[in-house]
Amino acid sequence: MELTIEQIEGVMSLVLDGRRRLDLRNVRFIDPYGLLLLDLVLRDRAEGSAPLNVVWPTHPPVRNWMQAMGLAFDVSATLRPKSRLPNVRTALQPITRIEDERGVIALVNGFDARLAERYPLDESPRRTLIRIMLELFQNIPQHSNATGNVSDAHGIAAMQDYRDGIVLAIADKGVGMRASLSLRGEEKVGSDAEALDAVVLRGLSRFRDPGRGQELMRIFRMVRSWDGTIAIRSGSALLYHDPEHGADVHDVAPFPGVQIALCIPTRVFGIGEVDGAPEDGFNEPDE
C-alpha cells in the first residue's frame, strides 16, 4: 500500500465518507503530497464530532520518515509546529506552516538551503524553483481566505527528494478556487472542475487586473515541459498530469481548500540519479 500523488485519494474517500477506523499498517511508502493530505484530513476529523481510530504504519522506515517530517500521530493532542528540523538525514524538508506574506521569503530560502545542502544545483533551474515556491507559498495568504470566512487561514508545505525526482507539496484548507473566483463578480463558476480549468488552464484569478493571476497556469506548463507530474486539487475536483497520460480532471471526495503537488525530475536541476542505496530509516518507493 502506498500513499502517493496517484493513490492518496482512496484514503481521502474513506475518511471523508465517515469511516471510523483507518488501517494504514501496511503502508510501505508515502510521499509529501500524501503526507500533507493525510495531515489535513485527520485534523479535520479530529476537529469534528466523528472520532477516527487510526492504525498507523508498522514499517519502520515509513514511521521514521513520517515522524521526521513532522506528522503528529496523535493529531488531536498535538499542535502542528511552524517548522521542525528533521531528526534523520533523509527528511529533506519537514511540514512547515505558511501564514502570511511577510514570512514567505524566509520559508522559501529555507527550502532552497535544505536542497542546496544535498545537491550542487545548476543556478538557472535553482532560481526557477525559487520562483515556483514563491508563487505557490504566496497563494496561501493571498487566496486561501479570500472571503474572510476562514478562522485559521494558513497552509502547509513539505519537500522530499528521491532517486529520480523531487516532490514539492503545498496544501491549505481554505475557501478553494471556486469560492475565490466567485469574487470576480462575473458569471458564476458552476463547479470545482470548472474553477480548476479557469485558474490552471486559462489563467484566471479573483483579480480582474490582467496583470494578476496566471501563476498556476505558468507553473503547470513548466512542469509539463519538464516531463514532470503535477496534481492540483480543489473541492471535489483534481487536475492530474503525468508525462505518460497527459492531463485530465477527476472527481474526488469534496474537501476544502487547494492542495498541490509537483514531481520534478532531478535532471532538470542538473542532478543525476541519486547514487547509493537508501540508508536505514529512508522512506523509498519500491522498485
Predicted regions and their residues:
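Flexible, glycine-/charge-rich segments associated with ATP-binding catalytic modules
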Residues: 1-16, 76-82, 86, 201-287
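Amphipathic alpha-helical interaction surfaces in cytosolic regulatory modules
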Residues: 2-77
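Conserved ATP-binding N-box helix of the HATPase_c
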Residues: 33, 39-41, 123-162, 220-223
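P-loop NTPase nucleotide-binding core
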Residues: 64-100, 263
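Helix-loop-beta hinge of the Bergerat
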Residues: 90-121, 178, 184-202
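A short mid-domain helix/strand-loop element embedded in enzyme catalytic domains
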Residues: 101-116, 125, 130-138, 159-179
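Conserved helix-loop functional segments at active or binding sites
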Residues: 117, 142, 146, 205
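ATP-lid-like helix-loop hinge signature
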Residues: 140-183, 240-245
